[in-house]
Amino acid sequence: MNPVRKRRLFIVLAILAGVGAAVALALSALQQNINLFYTPSQIAAGEAPEGARIRAGGLVEKGSLQRDATSLAATFRVTDGVATVTVRYQGILPDLFREGQGIVALGRVDAGGMLQADEVLAKHDENYMPPEVSQALEKSGMLKHYENGKPGGAQ
């Protein structure tokens, strides 16, 4: 092989190796930031991987909120109308967090099936519901019940 071809081959191989390394790094970074959404039914059925960071959403069950008097810890139940999962959160709950409202919690499922949340997101007005929560409630038939019971909903 003549020197010019050898040099071109080396350059092409170096470029391919660089592109391959860049793609591998990008995929690795994206994989670490993926938070899959699970409904309470899926978590209760054991579909959510234990210890993996997930998003879970549904309606906060009325009467389920318990706050620790000595810390910022809060425990509450989230339902999709079919199943319920207990969520434990250490921190200040959002101002719009209420029982009977839709939320999305980010965290990890422990061995007991409880979601240990490190972030809780509440809907930002009475008409908005996160798309994942809305779809989960629609599948379970609870969306109409929620809309009929909320302020401004059909009575």
Curated annotation (Swiss-Prot):
Presence of the UniProt keyword Nucleotide-binding in the record: no
Binding site for heme: 124, 128
Subcellular compartments: Cell inner membrane
GO BP of this protein: cytochrome complex assembly
InterPro entries given in the database record: CcmE (IPR004329), CcmE-like_sf (IPR036127), NA-bd_OB-fold (IPR012340)
Segments in the Periplasmic topological domain: 30-155
Keyword Methyltransferase: no
Cysteines joined through disulfide linkages: none
Keyword annotations: Cell inner membrane, Cell membrane, Cytochrome c-type biogenesis, Heme, Iron, Membrane, Metal-binding, Signal-anchor, Transmembrane, Transmembrane helix
Cytoplasmic topological segments: 1-8
A single cellular component GO annotation: plasma membrane
SUPFAM superfamilies documented for this protein: Heme chaperone CcmE
GO molecular function: heme binding; metal ion binding
Transmembrane segments: 9-29
Matches recorded under Pfam families: CcmE
Membrane topology per record: Single-pass type II membrane protein
Family as reported in the entry's similarity comment: Belongs to the CcmE/CycJ family.
Its job: Heme chaperone required for the biogenesis of c-type cytochromes. Transiently binds heme delivered by CcmC and transfers the heme to apo-cytochromes in a process facilitated by CcmF and CcmH.
Full protein name: Cytochrome c-type biogenesis protein CcmE
Originating species: Azotobacter vinelandii (strain DJ / ATCC BAA-1303)
